[in-house]
Amino acid sequence: MIEFKKLIKAKALYQEPDKIWVAKGMKFFAVDYNGKRVSPIVHVGGWKDRLLGCHRLSSQLLRVGLHHLLPLKNDNILVTAKRKTYVFDREGNVVNAWSEYQGNKPGHQGVCVTPAGTVFFAEYLLNPNRDHDIHLWRSTDNGMTFHVVKTWKAGDIRHLHFVKWDEYEQCLWLGTGDYGENGSENRLYRSADNGESWELIGQYSQDWRAIGVCFTEDALLWGTDAGSCPDTVHFVRMDRKTRRIEILQDFEGPCHGCASFSDGRAFFSTGVEGGENEKDHYSRMKEYVNGRCENVWKLKKDIWPLIMQYGVMRFPLGTDNCHRVVFTTMGLKGHGEWVMIEK
């Protein structure tokens, strides 16, 4: 049975074969797989955000901190903070700051960089009245400029959940949510031309509502994100050839994390957000084995209210090129914000 241990009190944002990029409040740096720092510390933003980000509770409550990190093709680094995205050079200098997008930040898998170096940025905002146009942004110059590559008109969808590169098909996948008539806002799109055009692959029902997808040679896998509605949370497989989906099993709570690894393994995590379809107050880590997900670890929600932080386990970006499981626990008993690593 797989086991995990605490590595460092921080958030894991991006994983590489030889290091893990982590964030503590409004600063980021890289550590090796023993938790030793192997890069300079880079501070982000002004003194107010840095002060609020020093303490985990204030950082989680006010959504202050760093949320995404992407190493770019030219060795610069893109990071997202609340309502602002920065690009840093190798010396830790800010070379660009961008804030034209809507929302505090993208979804957890709402940014990606392709092997050719194109950066995609998917807008995520609450948008309860569906009165905002929603945009997918693209940069072809290493994050120095961003331009809208696709727009969903107000009333069409609520927001974008993820955009992710698929090494198997050499394409991009994008997911939207959350409700709509007959689940019309829940969609899966595919682009084979660097985001110029998007083919609608599937739509309707909560089974198309995902926060991200995992890739295998013959399928896409995801858990549904039906946290605040009564629908049962499902684990779904989509065949690459037929594009048909199959419900493999039920989950105990909404799927908040998923990650594929270079050795062929795939992991999924469920969270605690207070939805009526949750079976209990535990967040679970699951491994995909022989066509099903098996529970390998679980933690109970901590004492702090859900408005401060859901109880979740989240994977860093970049796992597809790595073989060792790394993730961050947040809002869980004894694991308020820890980077965990496979023993």
Regions found by a protein language model. Name each.
Residues 5-17, 49-54, 58-72, 103-114, ...:
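Repeated scaffold domains used in trafficking and secretory/extracellular systems
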Residues 31-32, 88, 139-140, 191-192, ...:
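Conserved Ser/Thr-centered positions that define the repeating blades of beta-propeller domains
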Residues 39-41, 51-59, 94-101, 147-153, ...:
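A short beta-strand motif characteristic of beta-propeller blades
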Residues 79-80, 127-133, 156, 177-185, ...:
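Short, solvent-exposed loop/turn segments at conserved positions within beta-propeller repeat blades
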Residues 88-114, 121-126, 148-153:
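Asp-box/WD-like beta-propeller blade repeats and closely related beta-sheet repeat scaffolds
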Residues 216-233, 248-304:
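Loop/turn-rich, solvent-exposed surfaces of beta-rich toroidal or solenoidal domains
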